[in-house]
């Protein structure tokens, strides 16, 4: 009976909560912020070539969010301890 609990603990492949929250947060940002940027710049900033510049600003926003996600992913701790290998 004890052995089953030990096996289930080692086979626990659940995703940490902070990783899921980060993923959901960036997913929501990736969906909403470019739309908000597009419509805000369309109505307030650009005159003349409104849709072109508003679309470009939304595309820039997507690239910013993706870059931030990549930086956050690289900075995240993998959770595996690093072993020091000493050669003698």
UniProtKB/Swiss-Prot annotation:
Membrane disposition: Multi-pass membrane protein
Membrane-traversing stretches: 19-39, 54-74
Annotated Pfam families: VMA21 (PF09446)
Topology, Cytoplasmic side: 1-18, 75-88
GO BP annotations, alphabetical order: vacuolar proton-transporting V-type ATPase complex assembly
Domain of life: Eukaryota
Family from the record: Belongs to the VMA21 family.
The protein, known as: Vacuolar ATPase assembly integral membrane protein vma21
